[in-house]
UniProtKB/Swiss-Prot annotation:
It comes from Mus musculus (Mouse). GO terms for cellular component: extracellular region. The keyword Lipid biosynthesis does not apply. InterPro entries: 4_helix_cytokine-like_core, Somatotropin/Prolactin, Somatotropin_CS. GO terms for molecular function: hormone activity. This is Prolactin-7A2. Its main location: secreted. The gene is Prl7a2. Glycans are attached at residues 36, 103, 135. The lineage of its organism: Eukaryota, Metazoa, Chordata, Craniata, Vertebrata. Pfam families: Hormone_1. Residues 1-30 form the signal peptide. Disulfide bonds join 101-218, 235-244. Expression restricted to the placental tissue. Expressed only in the spongiotrophoblasts. It is found in: Secreted. It comes from the Eukaryota.
Length: 253
């Protein structure tokens, strides 16, 4: 089987992004921020962070459950055993299969030098590009699953829950960024929808399973990245940039 992929996501790049982002906070003031409103009620920045982090946790759990439920109900036992055996025995295949996701306007840095070039004012685009991409991709996934004859109801229900939680996380994330940066310029954020979900309709079980596993992997990677950036923002807001920039991180630069 041959598959097409978008840009590679090098090993260790996620850690580099997190470390490098800490190096960019020296000029960020740690000051109280204004409240936002959700559903007509005032919600403090603390509440926004709390709800956003809760949603990332919910999405990760739903994502794991989706993969498990799909595998149990839609994939033959023989194929699953063979597929997992390929992953375990062929690490090169695993890396190739599950390390390419969306193309973003701000790509994940491949080394620390690249990571340090990301300016503070690019962080909203970095986060929102991922949130917008998954908002749209989750809608495509749900539509695709609903169109497949015999698709198990539990799979569709989990996909719907993921779509709902992603939309909620997007709203909270926007509110957080608006509080920190002022009115966030979201109009210029580019995003791409995850490609290949049509393979879920394939009569070839292997194509379908691969597509679902790739979707699940890429969602996990991006939600983890958003979660880490939110933790960084929360640290700077409530503590200080000096504390968030530990001596070890300064020395590592």
């Amino acid at each position: 089987m041959s598959f097409s992929f978008s840009q590679p996501c090098p090993s260790g790049a996620l850690l580099l992004v997190v470390v490098s982002s800490l190096l960019l906070w020296e000029n960020v003031a740690s000051v109280p921020l204004s409240s936002n409103e959700t559903d007509g009620y005032p919600l403090s920045i603390n509440g926004l962070f709390h709800n956003a982090m809760r949603l990332t946790w919910n999405i990760k759990n739903l994502n794991m459950e989706l993969r498990k439920t799909y595998t149990v109900n839609q994939v033959s036992e023989k194929l699953y055993e063979n597929y997992m055996l390929d992953f375990i025995e062929d690490m090169e295949y695993l890396v190739k299969a599950l390390t390419c996701c969306h193309n973003y306007s701000i790509k994940t840095p491949e080394n620390l030098d690249e990571a340090q070039q990301i300016p503070f004012n690019e962080f909203p685009k970095l986060i929102l590009s991922r949130m917008w991409a998954w908002n749209e991709t989750s809608k495509v996934l749900l539509t695709t699953l609903r169109s497949i004859p015999g698709m198990h109801d539990d799979v569709i229900s989990l996909a719907k829950n993921i779509e709902t939680k992603l939309a909620e996380l997007f709203e909270y994330t926007q509110s957080i960024l608006n509080s920190i940066y002022g009115t966030t310029t979201t109009g210029n954020v580019e995003y791409t929808v995850f490609s290949g979900l049509e393979d879920l309709k394939s009569s070839d079980e292997e194509f379908s399973l691969f597509d679902l596993c790739k979707f699940s992997y890429c969602l996990r990677v991006d939600i983890h990245m958003v979660e880490l950036y939110l933790k960084l923002l929360e640290c700077v807001v409530y503590v200080s940039s000096d504390v968030c920039l530990s001596k070890n991180i300064r020395d590592a630069s």
